[in-house]
Design a protein with these regions (language model features):
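Extracellular/periplasmic carbohydrate-active domains that bind, remodel
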Residues: 1-206
Length: 206
């Protein structure tokens, strides 16, 4: 589990004013990475960051409409059981942010870039009602950003439009001669992203 080592490195870089944390070839296992301002993550081509069970718990909250809380006590801080709160028109996705593989709140100037791979590794929940799961199985987001600015996630731009081949289930570029080019080694590869691959609320400049 590399979570604490990575989070400590991000914290130290942030305190120094920022920097680039480089992930060289290898596999890095994480629960929840805490993003901080002015710290960029760079993944080399043979680097993989993969999710582990046991990420951060959803933050505590409370809704006045008793029927939509998971508990019966008015002091129960747990999330409501139903995935939608119809009386307040609040989607659960914009209520809980911390149960994610990467989490940032009120941060600025953060990049997660390179040509490596980020995968939930089957450990990010893809269904509603995460509080019905065991505590270590409640992360349902890969990237969760709340009230952030100037965020970049991706590979390297090569000034070509990307297309999708439904037969091969793969992306491709179109070369100058009109041929399909399936070389996407310039991309950051992201898979198994959970219920919300990217949840950005009150966030500008992505």
């Amino acid at each position: 589990d590399d979570t604490e080592t990575i989070n400590q490195a991000i914290k130290e870089m942030n305190e120094l004013g920022g920097g680039i944390l480089r992930f060289t070839a290898g596999t890095y296992n994480v629960r929840t990475v805490h993003l901080l301002s002015n710290v960029w993550l760079h993944l080399d081509a043979d680097a993989t960051i993969q999710g582990l069970p046991g990420g951060d718990a959803p933050e505590t909250t409370w809704f006045s409409d008793r029927a939509y809380r998971s508990g019966l006590s008015p002091t129960d801080p747990r999330p409501y059981a139903d995935p939608e709160n119809y009386l307040t028109k609040q989607d659960v996705g914009h209520t809980f942010f911390r149960n994610a593989m990467f989490f940032g709140e009120r941060i600025d100037n953060v990049k997660i870039v390179g040509t490596g791979r980020i995968t939930g590794n089957g450990n990010l929940v893809t269904s509603d009602k995460v509080m019905n799961n065991a505590p270590e199985k409640r992360c349902d987001k890969m990237f969760s950003l709340k009230l952030c600015t100037n965020i970049e996630i991706g590979g390297w731009n090569i000034d070509k439009d990307m297309w999708y081949d439904p037969q091969k289930d793969e992306p491709y570029y179109i070369d100058a001669d009109g041929q399909k080019n399936y070389d996407v080694s310039n991309m950051l590869h992201i898979d198994q992203g959970g219920h919300f691959v990217l949840l950005a609320t009150g966030t500008d400049g992505i």
